[in-house]
């Protein structure tokens, strides 16, 4: 076969592959928008009170944090919170650049995260979705958005354990919309010392974060003290650092997050460091 014909065949195959990958990503995007419409359309807006006088039992470092984060604001309109993020994911199978986004309910532990993992910084290798809607979960990851390598498939006990972690995960990101950390039927605060407190899940959900505050009254770390069920049936302990606080629409929030997960032997399993590019309330 002539070289020119061989090149045409190769070019044709590459074109088909690129089209198939594009179709896969578009299909996933459409699925994600349908899920977002299903779980994050709040309907009529309502106002959330930020009056700390309603919470006389807040531990001292927690109260100081809210005073810092709220900057004197007394209320906020409840809307879904959207943000874009970009970072690096270090997995046991390799290192990836991630472009991600998340939408969260403003006052309930519901969120939808989606992201594309790039190999070498340019090849869209993996597409992932993680949706938690309080007592349900829709998670999957696909190579080139076609070949599933992770899905929601747990026995009832493991699923319950996973939901405990996913609820905490929501609150670990809620430092970007701090009114969601006020006490309610889903969680409460318990004192530890002058610089730390526990954020404790309530009701059917079980688990807690040890939360550390700095001298500027910022939350700088939220960590689980024990391993918890994560995606892909892994038991891991999470340490999440919150950095680079900025004033966003009148609230002080961190714009860099650094997560590290450890296995039962306390060996580092995974890292995800990312910067928040945009937050919309």
Predicted feature locations:
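N-terminal mature ectodomain segment of secretory-pathway/periplasmic proteins
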Residues: 5, 63-149
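Buried hydrophobic residues that stabilize the cores of well-folded domains
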Residues: 38, 62, 66, 98-104, ...
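N-terminal leader/targeting segments and the immediate start of mature chains
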Residues: 31-81
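N-terminal Sec-pathway targeting helices
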Residues: 1-20
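Short, hydrophobic/aromatic-rich segments at coil-to-beta transitions
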Residues: 77-84, 107-114, 191-200, 219-221, ...
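Flexible, processing/modification-adjacent segments and terminal tails
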Residues: 139-202, 207, 232-233
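Membrane-interface motif at the C-terminal end of an N-terminal transmembrane signal
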Residues: 17-36
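Gly/Pro-enriched, hydrophobic low-complexity segments
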Residues: 195-281
